Amino acid sequence: MTNEIAGRAGKTERVLYLDCLRILSIAAMMLLHISAQNWSSLDLHDPAWMLFDILNGATRWCVPVFLMISGALFLNSLRPISTKKLLLHNVLRVVTAFLFWACVYGFWNFRNGEPAKEAFLSIFSGHYHMWFLFLIVGLYFVSPLLRCVVGDAQVLKYYLLCFAALDFAIPWLMDCLLLVRIPHTVDALTAIRLAYDRLLGYLPSENVFYFVLGSYLASKEIPKKNRVMLYIAGVIGYIGTVLLTRRQSLLNAFLDLTFLRNGSVNVFLMSAAVFVFGKYGMSRRNPGEGLRRAVVYVSQRCFGMYLVHALIIEALNEKFGLNTLTFQPLIATLLILTITFIGSFIISAILNRIPILKKYIV
C-alpha cells in the first residue's frame, strides 16, 4: 500500500513514521500469530501459558495501527483519490492478491491432507489471517463518505466521542463487571451484554473508528503533556490486557479472548499510544538517506510479508517440526519470529521484482 501524500508543491512525499509503524506492525502481527500457535492447548497454570499471554498481549495493537495508518493516508485531504483510482488500483489490487494467495493456501492445505472439497471452498474465505483484506476493501469503499466526516471538525469530534463510548467504553465496562461476578447480577448483566452485542451489529464497528482515528491523530498536534499521559495509559492498557485475559481465562477455565479484542479499551489505549509515539518519536529524528531508503524499501514489502508469513509459520511446524513448544518457549518463539520475518521479506522482495506480481499480488 502506498505511503505518500501530496506536498504543498503538488509533489508526493513519504511519511517516514508511517513506514516505521507499518514495519513494526507487521512484526507484531507475526508475533501475535506465532505466540497463539499452541497457547489455547496449554494448561492455564503452565508457565508457558503466561509467557504467551505476555507476548500476545504486547502485539494486540498491530491491526488497529494498520487501520490508523490506512486512515491517515486515505482520509488525508492533501492526498486526493479519484473513484477510478480507488477501484482500479487500490480495491483491484487487494482483490487480485486475495484470489492468488487464497489459491496458494488452498493448495497448501490440500497437500497437507485436507480433503479437496474443503481445500477448494477455503479459497472463497481465504486463510485465517486474510480476513483483514475483506475489512480493508470495505473501508476503501466507504472512505469517500468518511472523508466528509473527517472534513468537518465538529462532526469528526462528535463521531470519535460517540463511538468511543458505544464501541469501546460501554461494552468494556460491562465485560469488567461480568469479570468481578457481583452476586445476583451475573445473569442480568449477561443478558444485557448479549442485547448490547445485537445493537453493536447495527453500528459502525471499532475498525471504522480506528480508520477515522488515524486521520485525526495524524493531522492533530498533540501537546507533550497529553502525549506523556497517553503513553502511561498505553502501558496501563498493556498490563490490563495481560492481567484481564489471565483473570477471565481462569474464571472460565479456558483461554478467553474477551479483553484481546480490538474493541477493548485496554487495546485501544495501547494502539493510540503506539501510533502517537510513532508520530512524535520517529518523525522528529533525522535519519541518514541510507536508513531512510532502507525503511521505505522494507515498508513497501510489508503487504507481501503479511500475505506470506502464515505459510512460513505453518511450514516451519509441519515440515521441520519447529513450533513454540519445540524447546524453551521464549527462545523458540523468537527464533520462529526471526525466520518468519526474514523469510517473508525475502519472498516479498523477490515477488516485487516481477512487475505484474508487484502490481497485482504483493
Give the residues covered by each predicted segment:
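Alpha-helical transmembrane segments and their immediate juxtamembrane cytosolic regions
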Residues: 1-362
